[in-house]
Amino acid sequence: MASTVSNTSKLEKPVSLIWGCELNEQDKTFEFKVEDDEEKCEHQLALRTVCLGDKAKDEFNIVEIVTQEEGAEKSVPIATLKPSILPMATMVGIELTPPVTFRLKAGSGPLYISGQHVAMEEDYSWAEEEDEGEAEGEEEEEEEEDQESPPKAVKRPAATKKAGQAKKKKLDKEDESSEEDSPTKKGKGAGRGRKPAAKK
């Protein structure tokens, strides 16, 4: 299936097309590939369902994806269907980049694979924005170096010995006055007062 994408803007929405193929005794393989287009679009095929046709025999039908890795062929089964047990399977999370080959490994079909073909225009604007961002970052660093650093906060001097003693005397006097005002305690230890602090 061919897709058309207009180049009216750089940030165009992706074009999504319904895609499907049939595998049977005569056509056991199908290759999904896209033609090189002038606009350099990124293509993906998201599989949705694999189902058997109404004329399928009551036998196991196994469909697999065939890939070429380092010159060696590698196959991955994606569904095993049988009309009396499981005539249809829903595919979730299988997104493939073309070219992709589907093969009917076992069974005679007909077996139908459907999905969504998405074509997105490659967006190189992020590279331009990144270059601009780096240039702006360098300018900001230079401006920061030109500015003087703010003056450091001056610490308050520590309390002197005389100030500490005066504060201690004041607290002692408050303790003595609060003891005189408080009512007498009953029970164990009643009548025992607190010894006044020695005066220095």
Curated annotation (Swiss-Prot):
Role played: Acts as a chaperone for histones, such as histone H2A-H2B, and thus regulates the assembly of nucleosome cores. Involved in chromatin remodeling, especially during fertilization and early embryonic development. May be involved in sperm chromatin decondensation during fertilization.
Sites bearing N-acetylalanine, chain numbering: A2
Region: Disordered, residue numbers: 123-200
Keyword Phosphoprotein carried by entry: yes
Effect in UniProt of substituting R194A: Reduces arginine methylation
Sequence positions bearing Omega-N-methylarginine: R192
Biased composition annotated in UniProt, kind: Acidic residues: 123-148
Residues found modified as Phosphothreonine: T4, T8
Subunit structure, as described in the record: Homopentamer, when bound to H2A-H2B dimers only. Homodecamer of two stacked pentamers, when bound to H2A-H2B dimers and H3-H4 tetramers simultaneously. Interacts with the heterotetramer formed by wdr77 and prmt5.
Main subcellular localisation: nucleus
PANTHER family (alphabetical): NUCLEOPLASMIN, NUCLEOPLASMIN-2
A single cellular component GO annotation: nucleolus
Modified residues (Phosphoserine): S3, S6, S149, S177, S178, S182
Organism: Xenopus laevis
Basic residues: bias regions: 153-170, 185-200
Post-translational modification as stated in the protein's UniProt record: Activated by phosphorylation of multiple serine/threonine residues, along both core and tail domains. The level of phosphorylation gradually increases during egg maturation, reaching an average of 7-10 phosphates per monomer, so that at the time of fertilization the activity of the protein is maximum. Methylated by prmt5, yielding both monomethylated and symmetrically dimethylated Arg-192.
UniProt keywords, alphabetically: Acetylation, Chaperone, Chromatin regulator, Developmental protein, Fertilization, Methylation, Nucleus, Phosphoprotein
Renumbered residue ranges of the record's region Acidic tract A2: 128-148
GO BP terms, alphabetized: chromatin remodeling; positive regulation of DNA replication; sperm DNA decondensation
Family: Belongs to the nucleoplasmin family.
Matching InterPro entries: Nucleoplasmin, Nucleoplasmin_core_dom, Nucleoplasmin_core_dom_sf
Subcellular location: Nucleus
Name of this chain's protein: Nucleoplasmin
Region annotation Acidic tract A3: where it falls in the sequence: 174-176
Motif (Bipartite nuclear localization signal): 155-170
Temperature-activity profile: Thermostable.
